[in-house]
Structures are given as structure tokens and as C-alpha cells.
């Protein structure tokens, strides 16, 4: 890439001297700014980024000619769908990154979309029903586990998936752990000895370093081949290794390898679907869509057998099926190793930039990759098979969506709302006798958790402290902090009603997009009264729909009524509120435990002579937990920021008072 830093189009000296965000906002609202930008865009390959007046990223795109591509959005003759037309009306700023080639821009675009999540791009949904398998290569002794969250704590960690059949994934991992000795626990069970897993051959004893990191990585690389679909290649590798051990008369090691081969054969026995040609390796992608959501299935065929079935869900509004397929291909193959890219990829529809993808995949693999859209014979039958699976996954997703719509409709009837609530928020308080008091705000959108909108609060009231709790006061404080911004908008008369209606939609561009249709308080009449009193102070008590859900008999209370609403605990609207209440409780309790653990850890470390608040904070940041500090050696502790050998010895001695070690031995 020729220009590695972000280039703002027409970046002036005035912009270089901007001292605060308000000045930049003034420039973004300049009517002539965008017209000037369009004149200065270079006719070179690269990526372009479009922002609104609030400097929020709307869209990321790529092109072999930035000037022609960006200008096409603003031509009256361009045939854009309603989604793109809506985006164009919001564009206030255009930025670009110039690259050496169009292939480079494709990789850059994929990374920008993944990291920034622009609103108008075709985004793969964070669908937690499809699990991943993670290998933490960033650790000295990596772990392997199943997760539904694809979060890279370290760029070296590796995710495989998302897998459609979680049962098959669990059985595969169980068989792998029986065949290959792997780290079984996230933390050691004992400080000074191995556990039972080592004794029965399930673990190589990583907690006591019975195996070197290099040898353990060799074992794990073989395991990774299973989830890369390279079973046949792994079998050949193991057979050669077994022969070498036999030639050296190391029959015990040869027997261990033989058992691993048997375990691998058990895995391949379950791969019933196969192709006539056992040498064929290809990926097959098909899609099913209802014009709102698309379900994409990817079948991985290796050595003639179906080894993996992956599933993706993507936004499909105002998108062609080919563009959705292309986005899935870009997302998936940008995160796999070169050995996982097959020589052939079959797709159901032609891709908008198929030749570019062929070049990019070929470069990534190191050998030629072919992308084709078959119409006849066996390859077309494969596409039809994958499409049937995609249709099934889409219908299953729509069935769950219909259930959520029925729940929100029932809730609207229960609370006498004129429209179905789209955004509902739940609040709960958590503490132990007033200590470490916190609150949670959880959000459901269209009946499903929207975790990107969750919020955590530390209770600031000085009257709520250890030994003195007041849930009512805490709830009132949270209501004030949550809605005071909206109260200011209402007082200023800034078109308050229109902002409420547009909140949460793509039409809203003023930054106020979090007005809830329903607010639910975890508790009874007391908590509800406290919340309403706080909202009355903000003059929002008549604008918000507020209710509370008491644990006893799942009773729903609303303002102005002393008795609970007439409802059935099993009706869909009540079940939705109960899910919201339970999620708010879980989120609040987990945050409270986190805060309590931090406080207890700090108080324990502050007992060590020479450790002040800053060094305690640095030590915890370095090791993440007291247990890790306790298991560390003096040399490892001395590597923490601000700790030399003498202070590291002091810390180590605090946790090992029976040990006898001198500073000279450490040095």
C-alpha cells in the first residue's frame, strides 16, 4: 500500500489546526464542502469512507478508480436503491485511502468493515446460534474450546467456523481431546502437582511444564488440521511419523500415534456425503433470502468428502444475492490460512467483482483458484443441495423472528400501546449491603438482546455505601443519568417529538437514537415509584412508557395503578419481559462481582509492603488476576511494569511465606 495513513480529501491547513470536535462539526456542515471534495478525489485504486455531519462512518467501499466510483453516487442518472439514496442524503464528508492495486483495496475494505461496522454496508450479523472453535495461539500453551463470540483478544488467536451443527462440533472436539493430549483446564487445579488428566494421558502436564511449548505447539498444529478439513493429509503425516518411531524401536510412541490414527478414522466415518472423485477439494456456497435477511451455507468438500458445514447470516435489504455472497466470501477467506483455501469455489450466483476475487484468493492461496457458477450436471446438483440447506436455515430463522413479533404484539396489547414496541430497556440494581453498588441497562430490539447497547453504571450516591443500601434511591439516580440528555432536548424545544419518532432508525442523524418504546424496572411498586419520581423531575414522566416486573407471581405494575395488570405468566408478552428482567439481573450481578473482585484483589495486594495503588494497578493489569500472580515466579513478577527484583521478591514471599529464597538467588 502506497499511502498507509488515512487521507482526508482536500485536507486544509484550517483542519490541521482544529482544536475541538465542535469546530470540526462546523466544517462538516459547510454546504460547499462536499462539492469541493468531489473535485479532489484521485483517479487511483483504493478505499473510500463516507461520513455524516456527526462524523459517523456510513459506508466503506473500494474501487479501481476512486474518482469515478465516488462521483457515481451523486449523479441523478444513477439507478440506486432506496437504501443507497438514503445514505447519499446523509453524506457530509468523504475520506480515502490510496492503494497500489484493486486487490489490496479489497483486503483493506474487508478489514475496515469488520473493525468499523458501517451502517450501510452489507454486514454479516453476529448470529450467536452458530458457534466457532477457538485456538488461543497467543498463549504459551494454547487452549482449544467452543465459543459463540468471535472476539480477537489477540491477533494470533484463530477461529474456525461458524459451524451449523453444534452437536457434531462438540463430538469432534471430544474425540480430538481423547486422541491427542491437550491442555484441559483454563487454570491449573494444583500449584505443585499435575491433576488426574495428566495421569490418564488426556493432558501433557502443561501446568507443571512436563512438555515444552514447542512440542505442545506441534501437537496442536495437528489438531488444527482436523478443523481445517485436512484429515487425509493429517492421516498420511501420522502414518509416516508412526513408521519412524517403529524404525527407532520406540514402540510406545508408535502405539500412541496408532491410537491417534484410529481416532481420526472415527471422525472420517461420520462424513457420509462424498463425491465420485476422491481427489476433489472445493467449497460450495448458496443463499436463501427474504429480501431482509439472507442465510448463506458453505459446504467444505475435501478429498471428495464433506468435512464442514458453515453458516452465515447477513443483511439483505436493497442488496443483490450476488453482492451478499461476495461479502460472505470476503469475510470468510480473509480470516483463514492459505492451506484452507480450496482450488475451486462454486457459487449459486455470479459475483459483482468475480475476477478481482479470483486474483485475491489466488494470491492468498499461492496457487490458482477458480470461482464458477455451474448450471448443469453434478456441480449444479451440489449447488441445489446447499441451497436446500440455506432455505431450511432461513425458514428456521424466520420462525424465531415470527415468535418475537408475536411477543412484542402481545406486550403492546398488555401495556395498551398504539404500536408494537421495537426498543425495550430493562434496569436492575446489584450490591451486597450497599457495597460495590452497580446498575445495569439491557436493551432488546425486536424482541432480541442488542448487547452493543448495554450499559453499566456505578452508583455514585454517597448515602449508598457498605452497610447502608437503598435500591429506591439507586434506581432514581440511574433514571436521571440515563434520560437527562433527553430532558435537555425537551427543554430546548429541539423538535422533541420528531426525535422520538425517528429514534433508532436510519433516518435519525442527530445522535439521539436511543429513545426506548418501553422501560422495564426490575422490582415492585416501590422501585417503579422511585423511577417515576426521577422522571417527573426531568419532565419525561408522560413521554415514557414505564412498567415494573415483580418476581413474586411475575406481576406487572404500571404508574397510577395500585394493583398489578391482569396477565398470565405464560403469555408471550410477559415471557418477553421476564427474559428482559432476567438478563438485566444477570448483567448487573456479573458487573457487581467484577467490581467486588477488583476491590478485594486491590485490598489484598495493598497489604504487601512497597506496593502503592499505582503498582497494584499495574500488577493486576499485567497478570489479570491474583491467582496468576500467586503462580508466577520471582522472575516473571519482576517483568511487570515498575517492579524490580527486590520488590518482586517481596511480592513472591508474601504468597509463599514458607519458602526461603534470597535476593542473590533471584539475581
Curated annotation (Swiss-Prot):
One of its GO terms (cellular component) is excinuclease repair complex. Belongs to the UvrC family. Residues 43-122 form the GIY-YIG domain. Residues 232-267 form the UVR domain. It comes from the Bacteria. One of its GO terms (molecular function) is DNA binding. It is found in: Cytoplasm. GO terms for biological process: nucleotide-excision repair; SOS response. It comes from Prochlorococcus marinus (strain MIT 9313). The lineage of its organism: Bacteria, Bacillati, Cyanobacteriota, Cyanophyceae, Synechococcales. CDD domains: GIY-YIG_UvrC_Cho. This is UvrABC system protein C. Keywords: Cytoplasm, DNA damage, DNA excision, DNA repair, Excision nuclease, SOS response.
